Amino acid sequence: SVNTVSVLFMINYAINWFLNPLIGRTINRIGERKLLSIEYSTAILVFTGYATTGSAWVAGVLYVIDYIVFNFSIALRTFFQKIAEPQDIAPTMAVAQTINHIAAIFVPALGGWLWVEFGYQIPFFIGAALSGCSLLLVQIIDREIRLHAPAKA
Protein backbone atom coordinates (compact mmCIF):
# COMPACT_ATOMS: atom_id res chain seq x y z
CA SER A 1 0.00 0.00 0.00
CA VAL A 2 1.01 3.64 -0.32
CA ASN A 3 1.18 3.93 3.47
CA THR A 4 3.54 0.97 3.77
CA VAL A 5 5.86 2.27 1.06
CA SER A 6 5.84 5.73 2.66
CA VAL A 7 6.78 4.25 6.03
CA LEU A 8 9.59 2.23 4.41
CA PHE A 9 10.91 5.40 2.76
CA MET A 10 10.85 7.28 6.07
CA ILE A 11 12.62 4.41 7.86
CA ASN A 12 15.27 4.28 5.14
CA TYR A 13 15.89 8.02 5.19
CA ALA A 14 16.13 8.12 8.99
CA ILE A 15 18.52 5.17 9.19
CA ASN A 16 20.71 6.41 6.37
CA TRP A 17 20.83 9.94 7.79
CA PHE A 18 22.73 8.39 10.72
CA LEU A 19 24.66 5.71 8.81
CA ASN A 20 25.94 7.58 5.75
CA PRO A 21 28.66 9.50 7.62
CA LEU A 22 29.82 6.19 9.08
CA ILE A 23 30.21 4.67 5.61
CA GLY A 24 32.99 7.11 4.70
CA ARG A 25 34.82 6.40 7.95
CA THR A 26 34.37 2.67 7.36
CA ILE A 27 35.97 2.95 3.92
CA ASN A 28 38.96 4.65 5.55
CA ARG A 29 39.15 1.98 8.25
CA ILE A 30 38.58 -1.30 6.36
CA GLY A 31 39.05 -0.31 2.71
CA GLU A 32 36.98 -0.46 -0.43
CA ARG A 33 37.39 -4.18 -1.10
CA LYS A 34 36.02 -5.27 2.26
CA LEU A 35 33.13 -2.80 2.25
CA LEU A 36 32.12 -3.70 -1.31
CA SER A 37 32.44 -7.39 -0.42
CA ILE A 38 29.96 -6.79 2.40
CA GLU A 39 27.68 -4.91 0.00
CA TYR A 40 27.64 -7.63 -2.66
CA SER A 41 27.38 -10.49 -0.16
CA THR A 42 24.41 -8.75 1.41
CA ALA A 43 22.89 -8.11 -2.03
CA ILE A 44 23.08 -11.85 -2.80
CA LEU A 45 21.19 -12.61 0.41
CA VAL A 46 18.66 -9.79 -0.12
CA PHE A 47 17.89 -10.75 -3.73
CA THR A 48 17.59 -14.42 -2.80
CA GLY A 49 15.31 -13.39 0.05
CA TYR A 50 13.13 -11.31 -2.27
CA ALA A 51 12.84 -14.32 -4.59
CA THR A 52 11.94 -16.81 -1.89
CA THR A 53 9.94 -15.00 0.79
CA GLY A 54 6.20 -14.98 0.95
CA SER A 55 6.11 -12.52 3.84
CA ALA A 56 5.49 -8.82 3.32
CA TRP A 57 7.28 -8.11 6.61
CA VAL A 58 10.39 -10.00 5.52
CA ALA A 59 10.31 -8.21 2.17
CA GLY A 60 10.09 -4.88 4.02
CA VAL A 61 13.09 -5.72 6.21
CA LEU A 62 15.03 -6.86 3.13
CA TYR A 63 14.17 -3.56 1.44
CA VAL A 64 15.58 -1.56 4.36
CA ILE A 65 18.76 -3.68 4.40
CA ASP A 66 19.06 -3.31 0.62
CA TYR A 67 18.72 0.47 0.89
CA ILE A 68 21.42 0.65 3.58
CA VAL A 69 24.03 -1.42 1.75
CA PHE A 70 23.30 0.29 -1.58
CA ASN A 71 25.00 3.34 -0.09
CA PHE A 72 28.21 1.34 0.28
CA SER A 73 28.67 1.87 -3.46
CA ILE A 74 30.41 5.16 -2.63
CA ALA A 75 33.45 2.90 -2.20
CA LEU A 76 33.48 2.41 -5.99
CA ARG A 77 34.07 6.13 -6.43
CA THR A 78 36.80 6.31 -3.79
CA PHE A 79 38.49 3.31 -5.41
CA PHE A 80 38.33 4.95 -8.82
CA GLN A 81 39.83 8.16 -7.44
CA LYS A 82 42.76 6.15 -6.09
CA ILE A 83 43.62 4.47 -9.40
CA ALA A 84 42.64 7.06 -12.04
CA GLU A 85 44.72 9.88 -13.43
CA PRO A 86 43.23 13.16 -12.15
CA GLN A 87 42.46 14.43 -15.66
CA ASP A 88 40.51 11.23 -16.40
CA ILE A 89 38.17 11.37 -13.40
CA ALA A 90 35.56 13.88 -14.64
CA PRO A 91 35.09 12.48 -18.16
CA THR A 92 35.04 8.88 -16.94
CA MET A 93 32.48 9.70 -14.24
CA ALA A 94 30.35 11.48 -16.87
CA VAL A 95 30.40 8.41 -19.12
CA ALA A 96 29.63 6.13 -16.16
CA GLN A 97 26.67 8.33 -15.20
CA THR A 98 25.37 8.21 -18.78
CA ILE A 99 25.68 4.42 -18.90
CA ASN A 100 23.87 4.15 -15.55
CA HIS A 101 21.02 6.30 -16.87
CA ILE A 102 20.70 4.16 -20.00
CA ALA A 103 20.69 1.01 -17.85
CA ALA A 104 18.04 2.60 -15.61
CA ILE A 105 15.71 2.59 -18.61
CA PHE A 106 16.38 -0.86 -20.04
CA VAL A 107 17.03 -3.00 -16.97
CA PRO A 108 13.60 -2.38 -15.34
CA ALA A 109 11.89 -3.08 -18.66
CA LEU A 110 13.80 -6.35 -19.03
CA GLY A 111 13.14 -7.22 -15.38
CA GLY A 112 9.44 -6.54 -15.85
CA TRP A 113 9.32 -8.75 -18.92
CA LEU A 114 11.14 -11.56 -17.09
CA TRP A 115 8.75 -11.12 -14.15
CA VAL A 116 5.67 -11.45 -16.36
CA GLU A 117 7.00 -14.26 -18.56
CA PHE A 118 8.81 -16.42 -16.01
CA GLY A 119 7.71 -15.33 -12.53
CA TYR A 120 8.78 -12.68 -10.08
CA GLN A 121 11.62 -14.83 -8.72
CA ILE A 122 13.70 -14.80 -11.92
CA PRO A 123 14.79 -11.12 -11.88
CA PHE A 124 15.84 -11.48 -8.25
CA PHE A 125 17.82 -14.68 -8.87
CA ILE A 126 19.53 -12.91 -11.78
CA GLY A 127 20.29 -9.98 -9.45
CA ALA A 128 21.79 -12.41 -6.94
CA ALA A 129 23.94 -13.99 -9.67
CA LEU A 130 25.16 -10.58 -10.90
CA SER A 131 25.95 -9.61 -7.30
CA GLY A 132 28.00 -12.81 -7.07
CA CYS A 133 29.98 -11.75 -10.15
CA SER A 134 30.56 -8.33 -8.60
CA LEU A 135 31.67 -9.97 -5.35
CA LEU A 136 34.29 -11.94 -7.25
CA LEU A 137 35.50 -8.90 -9.19
CA VAL A 138 35.96 -6.62 -6.16
CA GLN A 139 38.51 -9.05 -4.77
CA ILE A 140 41.12 -7.52 -7.12
CA ILE A 141 40.63 -3.97 -5.77
CA ASP A 142 43.54 -4.03 -3.30
CA ARG A 143 45.89 -5.29 -6.02
CA GLU A 144 44.78 -2.48 -8.34
CA ILE A 145 45.33 0.14 -5.64
CA ARG A 146 48.85 -1.21 -5.03
CA LEU A 147 49.61 -1.19 -8.78
CA HIS A 148 48.52 2.45 -9.10
CA ALA A 149 50.04 3.74 -5.87
CA PRO A 150 52.94 6.17 -6.26
CA ALA A 151 56.33 4.61 -5.65
CA LYS A 152 57.81 5.37 -2.24
CA ALA A 153 61.29 6.85 -2.19
Residue ranges and their predicted role:
Residues 71-84:
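Intracellular juxtamembrane helix-capping segments at the cytosolic ends
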Residues 113-131:
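A membrane-interface helix-boundary motif in multi-pass transporters
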Residues 127-153:
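Multi-pass alpha-helical transporter architecture, strongest
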Residues 2-3, 86-96:
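Loop-to-transmembrane helix entry/capping segments in MFS-fold secondary transporters
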